[in-house]
Amino acid sequence: MLWKSVLPVALIVLGIHDCSFKFIEIDKNEEEFAMSMEHVLFHFNENQNDDFAYKFLRVRRSLRKKYTQKYLVDLEMGRTLCGKYDEDIDNCPLQEGPGEKKVRCTYIVETRVWVTEFTILNSTCVQT
């Protein structure tokens, strides 16, 4: 008899627990996401042993962990003709021919926009 009352409670708790850890699709134009992606690009360029800057080519997937400001992003970046410390990387042309390099990366970044704090929790990149 006790199991009849415990089972529904256990299912509710498991359901709430399961829902709280899922990533959900988000709009790529969401302000907090856009700011996080600027940090991801800065982080990537800072950590490259390359004098040239990379820029976003395409965000393949953008997700946010439910009830948090943790973002998971799958993106592609390309090597530009500009140096990584140049001002306007967005308008730099991509390298072509022998210098051409493209990477596909997955980042998990936690954002606290109200204090301008971004933390890279995990990142993986491969050349394509």
Curated annotation (Swiss-Prot):
InterPro entries: Cystatin_dom, Cystatin_sf, Cystatin_spermatogenesis. Keywords: Disulfide bond, Glycoprotein, Protease inhibitor, Secreted, Signal, Thiol protease inhibitor. Glycans are attached at residue 122. Its main location: secreted. Residues 1-21 form the signal peptide. GO terms for cellular component: extracellular region. Disulfide bonds join 82-92, 105-125. It is found in: Secreted. GO terms for molecular function: cysteine-type endopeptidase inhibitor activity. Belongs to the cystatin family. May play a specialized role in spermatogenesis. This is Cystatin-12.
